[in-house]
Amino acid sequence: FLSDFQVIRLFRACGCVKTKGISVEFLFAYILGNAFRSSSFYMQQRMQELRGCFSKNTYYRFLANPHVNWLHFTTRLAVRIIEQFLKPLTSENRRECFVIDDSLYERAGYKRTELAARVFDHVSMRYKKGFRLLTLGWTDGASFLPVNSVLLSSTKDENILGKRCSFDHRTLSHKRQEMACEKATTV
């Protein structure tokens, strides 16, 4: 997967560069493989089953790197998968379209979660604590591929329950924070 779709090249184009220590390829392959394991990084470390030769600081610093544009990365990776893998399998008669889904993402420990808010759930017709997960996906009627997703908070300050961290206005983190407080129609 990593070599077929040139994932590491895409990753570097989206701002991820490591100068020393463990390579980006190894760390990203481990994180990607973690999605298919039965336990998280924390539980692997606690049970002494950790297969990586890096510290937890390296792992979490890599995921929280403010210079990596994850939104751009997932979009470019989805385009590459669609163009190289899914389109050749799709017949000319089949129509392709984008699907936008707005789901509730409940968060129990909301007090320490940045920008957690009271969000209205249209299914139960009640306010719940958490986020709205806005997902853009591509489909040809038989297969579905998520292209992008954004966690949205509330546009009203009185509905925001979690703390709001301050970031440098030039960073991607600040832009993501501003995007989270916008309406879903403008995102």
Question: Where do the model's predicted regions map?
Answer:
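Conserved, well-structured functional cores that handle cations and Mg-NTP chemistry
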Residues: 1-187
